């Protein structure tokens, strides 16, 4: 149903799509579509827990993820037990890095930071810097000294170096210069027009037609700042059986621009296209929907 890979949940012995909820249980030995062998890539919290248990046999490990926190108030109970020192290691996703204060935590580690550093979206550097800054602040919060270990293939990367040094001012100066050069927020606004439907070609044609109408409307207002990129597939090109494309607009999100989009949408709706595609507009987007 989706173009995103399925996530393997070992304790439930199932493959699950975290976008549409589709699941395969039990896990098939071969791909049901092509008959090939299934390959497992990357690592999740369950895989990391296994590696930790093998490396540190006596360690008491508390894992926090979607599977282990499904019950009501599970997060609070786990944090309380860890604070009482019933466990030696707290393993989880980004939730364990934010706003927590355990006075005897002296070592914090981040695995696979490169997936965030080189991830999609213009805020990837900002998000990476923010996460590392939070992580560095988790350890050694009382009298005991703390350390933070960051796993990366590019330790010399400026963002990682600045984050490790907690140099917010230098990071800000580099990031704001980069965004100005690329015309990213705050020097413009991102507006994304998304299209979805059951026929790939029809959805692409609808996105292309909307872009043509927008160009015609914008030509009547030459002083209105606007750049149109696309149509291109969304980051998840198919979601729940629907093909998805987008137009990315660099604009100034003011009354004149919103009036332009309203006119374009009205004219697009009046045209009789062979196959309709649903349209959604995000006026304050990060670049995808």
Regions found by a protein language model. Give the residues of each.
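Inter-lobe coupling/hinge segments of SF2-like helicase ATPases
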Residues: 1-204, 216, 234-237, 246-247, ...
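Short amphipathic alpha-helix segments
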Residues: 168-169, 204-229
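Residues at beta-strand starts and edge strands
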Residues: 187-191, 226, 241-245, 275-277
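Short amphipathic alpha-helices in soluble, non-transmembrane regions
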Residues: 206-213, 259-267
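Short beta-strand elements
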Residues: 218-234, 275-283
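Nucleotide-binding motor/catalytic cores of P-loop/tubulin-like NTPases across gene-expression machines
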Residues: 218-225, 238-243, 268
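Generic C-terminus detector
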Residues: 262, 266-289
